[in-house]
Amino acid sequence: MAAAPLYCVCRQPYDVNRFMIECDICKDWFHGSCVQVVEHHAADIDVYHCPNCEPIHGPYMMKKHNNWHRHDYTEPNDGTRPVQAGTAVFVKELQARSFASGDILVQMQGNQVTKRFLEKEGFNYPIVVHDLDGLGLKLPPPSFSVSDVEHYVGANKVIDVIDVAKQADSKMKLGEFVKYYYQPERPKVLNVISLEFSDTRMSNLVVVPDIAQKMSWVENYWPDDSFFPKPFVQKYCLMGMKNSYTDFHIDFGGTSVWYHVLWGEKIFYLIKPTKANLALYEAWSSSPNQSEVFFGEKVDKCYKCVVKQGTTILLPTGWIHAVLTSQDSMAFGGNFLHNLNIDMQLRCYEMERRLKTPDLFKFPYFEAICWYVAKNLLETLKELRENKCEAQGFLVNGVKALISSLKMWLRRELTQPNSEVPDNIRPGHLIKALSKEIRHLEDDSNKAVKTQGSAECSLSRSTLEKGDQAQQAARRLQDHHHHRRRHHHHHHHHHHHHHHHHSRKLPSNLDVLELHTLEVLKRLEVGQLKEDSAFSSKVNGKFKKVCPVPAAAVEASHDNALRLVMCNGKIIRERMPITNVAATVNAVEMYHKHRIKLERIPMCPEEKVKKEKCEDEFGVQCTIKKPVSQGESVQTELRTESPHLASSDSDSKAGDSAEKCSLESESSDGEDGGSQRDSGTFVEHLNSHRHSHHKQALKRERPTSPNTDCAIQGMLSMAGLLCPQASGGAADILQQRWWASQGNGSSTSSSSDMWDSSEPCSAPRSPDAEDGSLGEEYSYRESSLSPPLHPSKRHAPNPTPVSNQATKGKRPKKGQATAKQRLGKILKMSRHKGLFLMKPMVFLIPQQGGTPLDPQFLLQSSSICVFPPPLIVSG
């Protein structure tokens, strides 16, 4: 094998990393360092004579300056060629131009520039910070000089130097640049803008701003065991001579920039990276006469920003900018990729590829870091979804753009072998996983939008119909503190969503009973119940909303306004002030005396919600017991339901817990007659006593006619309507009970398109609910806004049976109903979890009673029992 040719006076082979110059006489090549010719100076030599030829042919000859406005100053100055960027003439013209003021700059304090602020407000405009305090940036003192840079970095450090007049890049040692910088006369303007010193001793003198450190992809996502070398782009030292100029450009990879002028002055010419401006920039960059066209004139606005000594500027992603050094300056800066503008960063990178930008001016291993970022963002999205946190918009948009770029890079690898996919990453699997997470986010976002949209409609409905419940709760709370008052005042309740007041008057007990009676008569086809026009006008579709319970209702739940014991339709005990302990003692006494067994009802959260809600609204719960064969009995409610529900065998089993919690009733054809007669009796009574009870809550005094008033109170108790309702909304609230029970039946029922459904719940009752308070899981599930249908015309749901430990082994056999039934067929066990089957000789101890109950009442309590949610009595 032939030996490599030797060159230069040193007789060394060719070294690609060393600058060499050819002798025009002997045609031999010489190292610039061996013949004392620097690279940037060689371009000005017209004819070079090596040291061997110089004694014979004389010294080398330099080029003549024919013009001062062209990169090639040897061109004739005939005035026909335009001015090129960077030349002396260009700089003078640039300083004379007028630009838009830098009013787009965001003036901030150092402690205000935080990651949270940028994530919330966005990083779309340049930020100027005049004080270093709070920015986290540490730099050498302003007395730090170019020679100090040489001391910390090293004189032999090879750096890239730009000849400003020619806009040409060349390499030289740092020591040579420093020597040239301190010359009294500098024939050329040299600019150093790419001295990265992270691997030098000077790195210890500089600490990058906190915002750049916390947001940087390299610092946060680049693994230590990466096959690719870690990019160092965070610490640059820029040393520029006066009149140095860098033409318009976008920093590599669309990186953002932090820039601090240690001493001197810099002038930035800024252009916003709009789509139009980016398209113009790409066309301008690829044009052959790029240096002859000032890009600032091609866009709508170009802003001028003067950065003086001690000032820091942060440039966002993609901003097109040029820099003029108006005086000798030293500055420190750095570049960083981040999550805020992923889309723009990728667009800038693809633009660099289309423009065939040399690797020297591109972000090192840009594609590799994008793969690392994609892997980490996948984990971030998973955590957000698992924690049920909403992903920020910039992150979602960035991941979408990243997925598109990753797919494109994979396709490009089929034809281009230079892959930057890390070895420990499965690209196809990663892209699929990211796409899946994005789909989850979009699905959740669509659900959130629907929920938000329905919230407005539901809250509007709540304002008109359900807002009255908050009024009722407030009234009960006031009654508890002022129970000796004979009259109640009407109060305004401030709705916590809509922030406006309701001033509607509350109806009396007779009004409520009349509305309910008319409702029952309509279902029995005796009379028609007119739909509320205000409600019907708002029925536009189906909405779902889970509304929080008003605060007044929560407080009122701790002290239930009323506890009644009824027998044969008469109120035996009313509002007896006895504690829970006293009630328990009474229960024990009743157990020993009458062999009555007390049980506590385990309730799921949803059952507790509806149970306590009904209790807060109406004050009591009532059941109608009907003896059947063998002394067993079942319960029914005042309301009726479609007949075909009674024939379902599945309804006799343990039903859905959500349905059991609702207050719903069923009726049979054979019982319509009796119900009709009883209802008619109460309608007559309502018409005669309505005005005497108007605008009054439940009376605390002995009525004038005990038998009549007891009958009214009994019907109210059986209907669950003892608490006064708001005028105009009572009928709607009554109807809503049926909606809640119908909708909570089963998610697979045939009527699921019209009525809401909820998941069955079997969680035990919380301790807070046992003492009359509301648990944390208390929520009100608003029904669909579908128009209310007549109960006999609605389709019955097919509830899914749910096992309930409290009801196992206690279901009575179906038997013949008694002759004393009043308003409906027997209520099946599957329809009410909180109402249990009891024998005729059973009563309930009130939760807040007064004096112990007379055992004589046991002989009369054969049809009606009123009991609080926590306790039931069974024989």
UniProtKB/Swiss-Prot annotation:
Its cofactor is Fe(2+). Residues 650-663 have a biased composition (Basic and acidic residues). Signal peptide: none annotated. Binds 1 Fe(2+) ion per subunit. Residues 197-353 form the JmjC domain. Substrate binds at residues 246, 266. GO terms for cellular component: nucleus. Residues 448-462 have a biased composition (Polar residues). Disulfide bonds: none annotated. It is found in: Nucleus. Its main location: nucleus. Keywords: Chromatin regulator, Dioxygenase, Iron, Metal-binding, Neurogenesis, Nucleus, Oxidoreductase, Transcription, Transcription regulation, Zinc, Zinc-finger. Residues 478-505, 688-697 have a biased composition (Basic residues). Belongs to the JHDM1 histone demethylase family. JHDM1D subfamily. The PHD-type zinc finger mediates the binding to H3K4me3. Binding to H3K4me3 prevents its access to H3K9me2. This is Lysine-specific demethylase 7A. The gene is kdm7a.
